[in-house]
Amino acid sequence: MPALRKHPHTATKHLFVTGGVVSSLGKGLTASSLGQLLTARGLQVTMQKLDPYLNVDPGTMNPFQHGEVFVTEDGAETDLDVGHYERFLDRNLSGSANVTTGQVYSTVIAKERRGEYLGDTVQVIPHITDEIKRRVLEMAEPDEDGNRPDVVITEVGGTVGDIESLPFLEAARQVRHEVGRENCFFLHCSLVPFMAPSGELKTKPTQHSVAALRSIGIQPDALILRCDRDVPESLKNKIALMCDVDIDGVISTPDAPSIYDIPKVLHREELDAYVVRRLNLAFRDVDWTQWNDLLHRVHEPRETVRIALVGKYIDLSDAYLSVAEALRAGGFAHHAKVEIRWIPSDDCETDVGAATALSDVDGVLIPGGFGIRGIEGKVGAIRYARKRGLPLLGLCLGLQCIVIEAARSVGLTEASSAEFDPDTPDPVISTMADQRDAVAGEADLGGTMRLGAYPAVLQKNSLVAKAYDATEVSERHRHRYEVNNAYRERIAESGLQFSGTSPDGQLVEFVEYPADVHPFLVGTQAHPELKSRPTRPHPLFVAFVGAAVEYNNGERLPVDIPAIPTADHQSNGAEHALEDAPARG
C-alpha cells in the first residue's frame, strides 16, 4: 500500500467561499469579514475573486449591469468585491486578485497557439482547470516583502449549479486534493427564506444547494445561513444533519445593521475560531481595538451631514460603491454620519433644477463617468456650488467638469471636452496623446486607459497639500482625457488654480479655488476613493466632509430659486431634449 502524502503544517491554507440558491447573498462581504477576523487574529491573509464571465475584465462592462470597476495599484480593472477585500483587510491587492473566464481562456488559447501543449487536444479538463489552479496557487507565493500568506481566501463568483461556474468549482476541488484536505476549507453561503404565510423558515433550498455542491465532489466544511432573522438552534441542527456539516460549522448570519457589523456577527457565531481550529492555524485572540472604535463612530455619530452625489448611474448604487464608502469613512473621521442624496445629474441642467436638488445639502460630489449624458447637469451642479460657497469635490470626470465650468465663466461659452463634442471650438479637455488610437477606434478599448497609481506634486499651502499634509502623493487613475494645457492661462482668469500636476508639470492632477474665494471646491483627475479604508479614511474625503460639517454648522445664505418656466417654455425644452437624445447616448 503506497504511503500517504504528507502536507507541511506550515503550508499556506486555502479557503474557498461559494454561494447557492440565489445570487447577491453577500459572499464578498462574508469573505471580506472573515478575512478581517483572521487578520485581527494576527494571520497574514490575502484574497482573490474568481469571476465566471467571459469578459477579460469589467473595464468595458455597463456600470448598470456590473457596478463599479475597482482599479488596483498596478492598474488592473477588477470586480467591486476586490474593493471590499482591500477595505476590510486594509491592504493593497494586485491584479491577480481577480480572475475571469476571459483571462483564463485567453491564456490557454495563447499557449495553444505557441505550441506549448505539444499537440494535445485542449479541453476544459485539464487545461482550463489547470490554468485556474495555477492562478489560485500563485496567491500563496511570497509578496514583494518576502511574506508568505497564512491564508488565501478565494471567492468563487456565481451560484452553484451555473454552467459558467463549473470549471472554477472543479479547479477548487482539485486544489483541495493537491494541497491536502487539512490545508483547505470550503465555506458555502446559502439562503434560508422566511415564508410569511406559514411563519416558517425553510431549509430545503440549502439542502438542495449543498447536494448540488456535493454532486461535483465538494463537501462544505461550514455553511453561512443568510436570513432576515436568526436561525434557531433546532433548524441549525437539522441542516447540520442533512448536509453532513459539523454543528459548529453551521453559522446563522441575520441581516446586520451595517456592513461593518458583519465581522462581529461571524465572531459571535465563532466562525473564525472554527476555521483556525480546522486548519490548525497558530493564532491569537481577536484584537477589537480598532474595529470597536470604527463601530462606535458608525453607530453613535455626533451630527449628520447631507452630501449630494450627482451622477448618471445612480439607479444602481454599486456603480459608485467606493465613492459612497469613502464618503462614509470621511464622516467617521469627524464622528459624523454622511447621508448621501442620490441626485440624477440631468436634474441639475438648469439653474432651477440645481437649486431645487441641492438647496438642502451640505456638500456636492461629482464622481467619474463616461459619455455625454448628464454632463450639463454636472456642470450646472458645479456652477451652483461655486456661486453658493457649497463644498464640492470632483473626481476624474468631476475635475474635467470643474474646468469646463470655469472656462465658460470667463467667456469661453462653448468650452467642452473632446470626448463629448469633438467639434467644440474650445476643447479645454483633450484626448491624451497615447489614447488617440483607442478613441478613434483603431486600438482596443479594454485595458488601455491610463490605469493604476501615478505620482503628483502639489503646490505648497494649497488646500489639497494641507489635506494630504504632503506635497508629493500617489493616486490611482482611470481616464483617457486630460486638461488641455493650451487653455491653462485663460482658465486661471476664473480664479481656478492648478494646484497639483504630474512630476513633469504636463498633466493637471488637482484643481481648486483658493480658500478666500471658495471654502472648498476641489477636483482631482484621480480616483482617491479607491484608497480609502473605513479605519483609515482618505485625507481628501476627510477634508471634504470636514468642509461640509463646517458648512452645516455655519449660517447659510438664503437660497434664491429662479422662477419656474411657463408650461409653453417647458414644452419647448422637452422637445429639445427629445431632439438631443440620440446624440447624448
Curated annotation (Swiss-Prot):
Catalysed reaction equations from the record: UTP + L-glutamine + ATP + H2O = CTP + L-glutamate + ADP + phosphate + 2 H(+); L-glutamine + H2O = L-glutamate + NH4(+); UTP + NH4(+) + ATP = CTP + ADP + phosphate + 2 H(+)
Residues that coordinate or bind Mg(2+): D81, E155
EC number assigned by the record: 6.3.4.2
Record GO terms (molecular function): ATP binding; CTP synthase activity; glutaminase activity; identical protein binding; metal ion binding
Origin superkingdom: Bacteria
Pfam families, sorted: CTP_synth_N, GATase
Residues annotated as binding ATP: S24, L25, G26, K27, G28, L29, D81
Biological processes annotated in GO: 'de novo' CTP biosynthetic process; pyrimidine nucleobase biosynthetic process
Region Amidoligase domain, annotated ranges: 1-281
Chain intervals for the UniProt region annotation (Disordered): 564-585
HAMAP family, per the entry: PyrG
Family indicated by similarity: Belongs to the CTP synthase family.
Alphabetized PANTHER family for the sequence: CTP SYNTHASE, CTP SYNTHASE-RELATED
Additional record remark: CTPSs have evolved a hybrid strategy for distinguishing between UTP and CTP. The overlapping regions of the product feedback inhibitory and substrate sites recognize a common feature in both compounds, the triphosphate moiety. To differentiate isosteric substrate and product pyrimidine rings, an additional pocket far from the expected kinase/ligase catalytic site, specifically recognizes the cytosine and ribose portions of the product inhibitor.
Subunit details: Homotetramer.
Name the record gives this protein: CTP synthase
Organism of provenance: Mycolicibacterium gilvum (strain PYR-GCK) (Mycobacterium gilvum (strain PYR-GCK))
